[in-house]
Structure formats: structure tokens, C-alpha cells
């Protein structure tokens, strides 16, 4: 099991533990009003040389605590967008898929999980990743090697195939499809039905951690194994990974190139946090807001789902009303100036197109475009004030005691609780070190100076 443990350790260290970020994207986006007409590329995006993608596609990421209603709201948003004429894909990145259930697809349930978009109506498809099929499409060499290692331990082929699903495979597969659809101009809007908060953080951090792995670990692993393989294969109980294994990793990385720029571009990607008017869920939503901000994503809406309608009044429900009213006021205060929307609790379960369209009418105003770009404020910026270089990060809900700072190479590392974010510094600041930090009005300002 030693080689397999080493392999799992490499994957874990590269994909999970690094938490690193590349240097900021060498491109910028000029603010635009809404989206260009479907199928017509925008002309106001300036990109780094050699990186080409469809600049007019929007990504709406619905995230929140498990069970708050993300899938229903994402599905309703997809229906509204399709009715407005957008080529829309609602894509589940939650391992526990429920998109098919949301649209009440009984006969088609098992057809949906084919790793191909499933049409719902003109302009709308849904997509539930089937990880077994994704392994055959994208991870064949990696999976085959892991299975061969596991077989040497005496476990059955079926068990080996199950255990060969390594952490991060599903998230990276979803990222590859997002990148592919963007480059091929397949859709105008992709609505992502995300996993609960912790898994969502793993999803958005995957491209940057993979980038770190490819720069710092991959070349060393490949060259070392290439040198020792002829001797090691004579004495080791199993063969070491071949060149095709590393070629598979390189191919995956190339398919993901540029996806981090897509995810962190506020004119492309917006996060919509879904919550319920309950104190425990509110705390989770606050943490999610901080984590998304720390990763460079823009939250443009907070949606409070399942609010008790005012007409439901009796002695038993009064306490619930008082509690929800209190939490709702806190929500509006905490998240200002981010808009907070309130969606009432429906009389029965929201299932099927008709009920989802009713939900969409409550969620969005009649003339409202859910794909419109409404907030583009970046969570962190670089600047210069009174001759002093600064890094400014918007960190709502964080306190001074929560935050840790240190410099590593040409990166500024910010820690909040168990989360770590590596912020690549521009060349003009790469040699500087943090000298002082202050947290005022939800804004962390880190002053940088030359080392002594």
C-alpha cells in the first residue's frame, strides 16, 4: 500500500492542502451593462495573449448550507433565463444530485446521469455529472494506475474501481466542462447548483491549487520517477506510474487553463448565497460570504428562502414569526449593501416546471434579468497610499483575532480560522513584506514595505 499512500498523499497535497493562488490575471474587464445578445461576442474584454474564451457567457453560482433550497432556486433561475431567450445550462456540482428531482423527471431520471446535458425545453438543459463516466473520459490513465495498485492488495475489481475515485475528481471534471462550454460558446448562462458550503470552497479553490501543484510538485515527481523507474520496477511489488500517467495529468491541467480567471471575473461569475431565516443558517452564510470574498468571488445577492407568509398566524407560529423577523433584520444589516431577497414558504413542495416557474415569478421581478451584472466590486485590490503600497481585502464578519498574515515567496498569505488564501503579489510588490495591518469597516488594509 506504500505507493498508493504516496499517490494519495501527492494528490491530497497538490489539490487540497496547498490553498495557493497564482499571480493575478493579466487582463481586465471594462464594465458592461448586462449581456450582449445571445451568440454575439462582447468586444469590451481585454485578455492576456493566448487565452481565448467566450466573453459573453455568465456563470451564476448558487451556494449555501445543505437543505436551504439551492437546487430549487437554481432551477427556477434557469427556467426564467431560458424564457428570456438565453441558452441556459443548469449544472449540478453537488455529489448528491437532485436536479432531475427538482424538475420531477421520473422516466428520464437515469438518463440524466449520462455526463451529457439533458434537454428540458428550448434553450434549457440540465447536467448531472456521472463520476464513473467522467473517469473513463478524462482520468483513464490515472484511474487505471490506482486500480492496478489496489488490486495488488487483494481487494476485488469492483472495490478497486470505487476506491480509485480520488478526492477532487468530480470538482475538476465540472471545471473542465465550464471551460469547454465557455470556449465553444455553447451557452449564454451556466447556473451552478453547488454543494454545501465546505464543498463549494473546495470547488472554487481547485484551479489555483492545481496550478500550484503543477508548478511546484508535478515536475519533481515526473522527473524523479522517470529516473528511478527502471531500477524500482525490478524490485518493487508494483510498477511505478508510467509517462502516460503524467501525460494524463498534464492534459487535465491544459483543459483547465484559464478557468480560474473565469471564476474570479466579477463580470462573468456571481455568487448567490441561499439561506433560511434561522440563526444557525445565518452563521453559515456569514462564513460562506467571508470565504468567497477571500477567494476573490463577488456575491451579488443573498436569497432568504422559506420565509413564513404573514397570513400564517396563530399561537404556535407566532414564536417562529418573531424569530424569523429578527434574523431577517440581522441579514439585511449584516450583508448591506448586497441586496437581500426574501422568498416565502410555498404551500407545497416545489417540483416540476410549473411550480418552478411560480417560484421564479416570486424570486425575480417581471422585467428583471437574472443574468444582469449588478455588482463587480473585487474582494481585494492592490494600491498605493501616501507612498506606501497596500493590499486591501473586503472581509465582512471577520474580527482582528480571526486573521493571520505572513509572506511566503511572492505571495501574501491570509488566514481566517482554518481557511488560507495565497494572494499573488504584482511584481512591484513581490519583494515587500507586511509592516502593519488594520481592519476598519469590514476592510482589511495590509501595508507593505521593503524588508529591513
Predicted regions and their residues:
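Generic beta-strand structural signal
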Residues: 384, 407-408, 439
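Nucleotide-state-sensitive switch-loop elements of NTP-binding domains
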Residues: 56-68, 72-257
Amino acid at each position: 500500500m506504500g505507493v498508493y499512500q504516496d499517490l494519495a498523499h501527492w494528490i491530497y497535497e497538490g489539490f487540497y492542502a496547498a490553498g495557493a493562488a497564482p499571480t493575478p490575471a493579466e487582463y481586465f474587464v471594462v464594465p458592461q451593462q448586462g449581456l450582449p445578445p445571445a451568440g454575439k461576442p462582447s468586444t469590451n474584454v481585454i485578455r492576456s495573449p493566448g487565452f481565448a474564451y467566450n466573453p459573453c457567457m455568465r456563470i451564476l453560482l448558487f451556494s449555501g448550507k445543505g437543505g436551504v433550497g439551492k437546487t430549487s432556486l437554481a432551477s427556477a433561475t434557469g427556467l426564467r433565463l431560458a424564457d428570456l431567450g438565453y441558452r441556459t445550462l443548469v449544472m449540478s456540482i453537488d455529489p448528491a444530485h437532485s436536479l432531475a428531482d427538482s424538475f420531477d423527471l421520473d422516466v428520464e431520471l437515469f438518463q440524466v446521469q449520462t455526463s451529457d446535458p439533458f434537454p428540458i425545453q428550448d434553450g434549457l438543459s440540465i447536467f448531472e455529472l456521472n463520476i464513473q463516466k467522467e473517469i473513463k473520459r478524462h482520468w483513464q490513465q490515472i484511474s487505471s494506475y490506482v486500480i492496478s495498485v489496489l488490486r495488488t492488495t487483494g481487494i476485488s475489481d469492483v472495490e478497486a474501481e470505487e476506491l480509485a475515485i480520488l478526492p477532487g475528481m468530480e470538482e475538476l471534471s465540472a471545471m473542465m466542462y465550464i471551460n469547454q462550454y465557455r470556449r465553444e460558446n455553447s451557452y449564454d448562462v451556466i447556473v451552478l447548483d453547488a454543494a454545501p458550503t465546505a464543498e463549494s470552497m473546495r470547488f472554487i479553490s481547485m484551479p489555483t491549487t492545481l496550478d500550484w501543484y503543477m508548478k511546484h510538485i508535478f515536475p519533481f515527481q515526473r522527473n524523479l520517477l522517470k529516473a528511478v523507474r527502471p531500477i524500482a520496477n525490478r524490485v518493487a511489488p508494483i510498477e511505478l506510474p508510467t509517462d502516460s500517467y503524467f501525460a494524463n495529468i498534464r492534459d487535465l491541467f491544459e483543459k483547465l487553463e484559464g478557468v480560474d480567471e473565469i471564476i474570479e471575473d466579477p463580470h462573468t461569475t456571481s455568487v448567490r448565497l441561499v439561506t433560511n431565516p434561522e440563526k444557525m443558517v445565518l452563521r453559515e452564510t456569514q462564513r460562506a460570504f467571508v470565504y468567497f470574498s477571500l477567494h476573490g468571488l463577488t456575491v451579488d445577492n443573498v436569497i432568504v428562502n422559506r420565509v413564513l407568509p404573514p397570513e400564517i398566524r396563530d399561537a404556535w407560529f407566532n414564536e417562529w414569526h418573531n424569530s424569523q423577523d429578527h434574523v431577517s433584520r440581522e441579514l439585511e444589516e449584516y450583508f448591506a449593501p448586497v441586496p437581500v431577497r426574501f422568498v416565502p414558504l410555498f404551500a407545497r413542495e416545489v417540483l416540476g416546471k410549473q411550480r418552478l416557474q411560480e417560484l421564479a415569478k416570486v424570486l425575480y421581478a417581471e422585467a428583471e434579468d437574472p443574468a444582469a451584472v449588478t455588482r463587480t466590486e473585487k474582494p481585494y485590490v492592490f494600491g498605493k497610499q501616501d507612498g506606501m503600497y497596500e493590499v486591501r481585502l473586503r472581509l465582512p464578519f471577520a474580527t482582528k483575532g480571526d486573521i493571520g498574515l505572513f509572506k511566503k515567496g511572492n505571495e501574501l498569505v491570509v488566514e481566517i480560522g482554518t481557511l488560507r488564501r495565497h494572494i499573488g503579489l504584482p511584481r512591484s510588490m513581490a519583494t515587500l513584506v507586511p509592516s502593519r495591518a488594520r481592519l476598519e469597516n469590514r476592510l482589511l488594509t495590509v501595508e507593505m514595505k521593503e524588508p529591513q
